[in-house]
Amino acid sequence: MASSLKKLISSFLLVLYSTTIIVASSESRCRRFKSIISFGDSIADTGNYLHLSDVNHLPQSAFLPYGESFFHPPSGRASNGRLIIDFIAEFLGLPYVPPYFGSQNVSFEQGINFAVYGATALDRAFLLGKGIESDFTNVSLSVQLDTFKQILPNLCASSTRDCKEMLGDSLILMGEIGGNDYNYPFFEGKSINEIKELVPLIVKAISSAIVDLIDLGGKTFLVPGGFPTGCSAAYLTLFQTVAEKDQDPLTGCYPLLNEFGEHHNEQLKTELKRLQKFYPHVNIIYADYHNSLYRFYQEPAKYGFKNKPLAACCGVGGKYNFTIGKECGYEGVNYCQNPSEYVNWDGYHLTEAAYQKMTEGILNGPYATPAFDWSCLGSGTVDT
């Protein structure tokens, strides 16, 4: 009898433990983040590419009208103002996350950013082996992560917390990253089937980086999916002949490219679910950049975008105010006087207004899975 009772209790405790694990892996736990650690590309770059560039060949983001709505002078952000990472920092009550590269006499205790304009998830040498040129930068995700690992002892030494505690108290933003791995071959004329072969490799690179950071002590990850590139002025211009024959009647976007993007996102979500089950003590939150943005193209007026949502605010020529080789920042290229009414900034990137509304949808739902729990902050809404 006693033996049977012990077995019954053991079985009950096992079920209870298993249930706890499932709940922990499917719900976001509230944390008071003390810093933001960021990796990625131009969607999160707060100045790294600017500082890495030759002073005689500065990027367009070094000049007006970039930053004209908020940062003076331009900070190297690929927008007219703030990015998603900036609005997240504001919400958390943290300073804007400084770029690591080129920064001098800057404290990284409350945040550090390794994201670089043009960066890829896969290494440059690997892409070159596939016949894909990536000329912007060689600071891929693995290079960013290696740099972080190299300086981590110094970061911890300047903090009152040890390394694992510092990472555990941080919101780790993993991108967006991977978009350029697709951008380069698309603009080089590779077929969609060729490019699709990269998807599992890119997802694996993102997953491996997350695992490395978990091993270092990371506990909360915000992992964005890709954008609906079939609504991008740059892509709509590149594929204009075929896109106009097969465009979505509601949005004017090119469905084939959006379906490709969703294929990447589904693969990424599947991998994140696998990681979450394997690391139940960690919060891995998927940020649905695709749908958070796509709603603006579906109902632009509802979100305050009065002008054509597909056209670039800063650009020149063509149906989408975009010409390859004569982009925003070049001489003779004008920009709109009301960027807050535009979704698209320069053909590739978004306006501050679009990024702000995307951030609201991610931090307050429904575009984060699992949803953030902000109950411990005493505020349940994004106030930016």
Swiss-Prot record:
MF terms (GO), sorted A to Z: hydrolase activity, acting on ester bonds
Keyword Iron: no
Alphabetical keyword list: Glycoprotein, Hydrolase, Lipid degradation, Lipid metabolism, Secreted, Signal
Enzyme Commission code: 3.1.1.-
Principal cellular location given in the protein's record: secreted
GO cellular component: extracellular region
Catalytic center residues: S42 (nucleophile), D346, H349
Pfam families with a match to the protein in the record: Lipase_GDSL
Signal peptide stretch: 1-24
Source domain of life: Eukaryota
Compartment annotation: Secreted
The keyword Glycoprotein appears for this protein: yes
Residues bearing glycans: N105, N138, N321
InterPro entries: GDSL, SGNH_hydro_sf, SGNH_plant_lipase-like
Gene3D superfamilies membership: SGNH hydrolase (3.40.50.1110)
GO biological process, one term: lipid catabolic process
Family label: Belongs to the 'GDSL' lipolytic enzyme family.
Matches recorded under PANTHER family: GENOME ASSEMBLY, CHROMOSOME: A07, ZINC FINGER FYVE DOMAIN CONTAINING PROTEIN
Protein's name in the database: GDSL esterase/lipase At1g28670
